[in-house]
């Protein structure tokens, strides 16, 4: 019944293991990985090329890599979507404010990535979006107005 699985990708274990299992149950399920700008994962998935020009500093923790982790099974992943540091942080704060979900930075990126992909979904699709971090680690960052303002995001 699950049509889409969406999760942030760092070292790749969650998306690769869960994606493999879901595709064994239903080969048509779509596995979507969320990546950060400054990471090599999306471009490598699309081209097979490790492009060092894709690498630059980013702030989001837990999503994106400047290496190709051995855990990432690129054949299992159907699509990567990149999310900016700013959009991930703002989405995490929005989920806390509107939904009462105190989630981590990477979860904000995952939610934002899903929003960016929403036009690809059909009304009867069943999307599983995995949030695998909590907000307590980000009280001094994403949930701190001064930190957000220092980056020009508030």
Predicted region positions:
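N-terminal cationic-hydrophobic initiation segments that often serve targeting/anchoring roles
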Residues: 19, 23, 96, 118-119
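Short beta-strand segments
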Residues: 7-10, 33-35, 128-132
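Active-site/ligand-binding loops adjacent to catalytic centers
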Residues: 24-105, 142-154
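Short glycine/serine/threonine-rich phosphate/pyrophosphate-binding segments
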Residues: 8-19, 41, 106-114
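Phosphate-binding loop/pocket of nucleotide- and phosphate-handling active sites
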Residues: 57, 112-154
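Conserved acidic residues
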Residues: 3-6, 78, 125
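Glycine-rich ThDP/TPP pyrophosphate-binding loop and its adjacent helix/strand module
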Residues: 1-30
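Terminal helix/beta-alpha structural elements that buttress the NAD(P)+-binding lobe
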Residues: 4, 101, 105-111, 117, ...
């Amino acid at each position: 019944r699950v049509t889409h699985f969406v999760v942030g990708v760092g070292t790749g274990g969650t998306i690769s293991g869960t994606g493999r299992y879901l595709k064994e149950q239903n080969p048509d399920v779509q596995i979507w990985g969320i990546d950060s700008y400054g990471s090599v994962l999306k471009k490598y998935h699309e081209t097979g090329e490790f492009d060092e020009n894709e690498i630059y500093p980013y702030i989001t923790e837990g999503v994106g890599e400047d290496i190709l982790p051995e855990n990432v099974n690129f054949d299992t992943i159907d699509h990567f979507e990149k999310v900016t540091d700013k959009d991930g942080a703002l989405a995490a704060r929005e989920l806390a404010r509107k939904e009462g979900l105190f989630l981590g930075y990477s979860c904000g990126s995952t939610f934002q990535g899903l929003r960016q992909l929403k036009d690809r979904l059909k009304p009867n699709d069943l999307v599983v979006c995995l949030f695998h971090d909590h907000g307590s680690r980000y009280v001094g960052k994403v949930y701190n107005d001064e930190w957000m303002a220092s980056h020009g995001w508030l």
